[in-house]
């Protein structure tokens, strides 16, 4: 007699969650690899670097396009097909690579690599915490979101003020915020994954990519904040 009967209603949601989270991290990794490749390739292209550094309209257009893609993916996910969702995420990752290519001009390759490793370690630890903790992190959501808005506004103000003190304050606060968001977003995605029907492969793909985009943004922003702190300028 089986003393510990296994109920399908228990086993299937757990298996579905694991499938969903595996795809989230998988697509996030694909996005990061594409971003890294495009950034490296663009940094080694004199034509692309000249375009980025001399054509302000192109750079502003690039940033607007990135914001538009995030809004479309977040707001219209239910209306998009799995194929279009995948294409838009890949496009966003590539455009981010173009935007970030300048870091190879500003910082040494060794410091970029070491900062990436540090970021991966911090991200992994906090994502693991968010996934495994029994503590409900939803209460931190509003606080982290308000802090994020504060960081964005302070960064915009400092674009004109050029205050080094404000820049460092934003940087260190930003590290704390994105570390917290990593744990918060991971738990939120875990809760979402428990509700997803993995038999609907199209829906699974779309929401896996949406989750990947969320964690991708946390990782990229944490990396940029840490690079300001640990990066060695050329």
UniProtKB/Swiss-Prot annotation:
Keyword Cell membrane assigned: yes
Localization of this protein: Cell inner membrane
Keywords: Cell inner membrane, Cell membrane, Membrane, Transmembrane, Transmembrane helix
MF term (GO), any: calcium channel activity
Protein origin, superkingdom: Bacteria
Family: Belongs to the BI1 family.
Pfam families per record: Bax1-I (PF01027)
Gene (UniProt): ybhL
Annotated GO CC locations: plasma membrane
Cited CDD domains: BI-1-like_bacterial (cd10432)
Protein name per Swiss-Prot or TrEMBL: Inner membrane protein YbhL
Cytoplasmic side: 45-56, 101-102, 158-163, 228-234
